[in-house]
């Protein structure tokens, strides 16, 4: 089976040595595919001075993410676990770890064929990490994942409307969102966080530069321009 990594943020473009090595050794970056998935800026990341990073949100309109095929074929659950652990190392920027989750986020699986036995094996493996997989979500939306770490969204389509047939299963990182009164903050608050900490606005601009976009982007840009001409240092896309 062909696995792919569904990427909604900086592990696609970050030049950190660990992430660069992961992309080079495990992914076919030249074959990256634009796909439509419901994403938004929704996690206030402590590592980025509480500016916002990307999360899955089932009530969000579709944005653009990336699916990148893995180099290695998946022939067994052990093969899948190797890819999941490599993905988690890249996300957490660690050189050694046997984990695929933490309190702030977790590795998710989506299989195209519902009868695929890998999903059941995945659920059994993640049983010891249920607290990590109990991610918050807005009061008025269904969760993006279940307690066993299976992504609870339809199999994505390409942004051009074509079916995604190049991969049979997807691995991705789902981060715990930061909610306020049971909901996500709006684009003005998201922009304000970057305006206060402009050294971290590269996350937004580099996402856009690399084709990772959300339904909120135009409003976030509008808030940048309204607050100070030229935005907060990044290029205008």
Short names for language-model regions:
Residues 1-237:
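Glycine-aromatic micro-motifs
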């Amino acid at each position: 089976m062909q696995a792919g990594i569904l990427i909604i943020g900086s592990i696609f473009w970050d030049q950190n040595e660990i992430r660069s090595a992961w992309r080079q050794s495990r992914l076919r970056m030249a074959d990256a595919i634009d796909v439509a998935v419901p994403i938004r800026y929704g996690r206030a990341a402590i590592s980025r001075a509480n500016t916002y990073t990307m999360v899955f949100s089932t009530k969000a309109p579709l944005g653009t993410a990336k699916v990148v095929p893995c180099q290695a074929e998946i022939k067994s659950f052990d093969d899948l676990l190797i890819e999941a652990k490599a993905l988690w190392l890249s996300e957490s920027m660690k050189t050694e770890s046997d984990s695929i989750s933490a309190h702030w986020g977790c590795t998710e699986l989506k299989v195209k064929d519902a009868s695929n036995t890998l999903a059941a094996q995945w659920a059994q493996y993640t049983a010891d990490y249920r607290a990590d997989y109990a991610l918050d979500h807005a009061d008025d939306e269904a969760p993006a994942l279940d307690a066993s770490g299976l992504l609870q969204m339809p199999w994505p389509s390409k942004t051009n409307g074509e079916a995604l047939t190049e991969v049979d299963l997807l691995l991705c990182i789902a981060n715990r969102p930061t909610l306020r009164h049971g909901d996500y903050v709006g684009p003005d608050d998201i922009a304000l966080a970057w305006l206060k900490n402009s050294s971290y606005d590269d996350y937004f601009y580099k996402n856009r530069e690399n084709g990772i976009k959300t339904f909120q982007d135009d409003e976030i840009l509008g808030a940048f321009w309204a607050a100070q001409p030229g935005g907060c240092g990044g290029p205008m896309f």
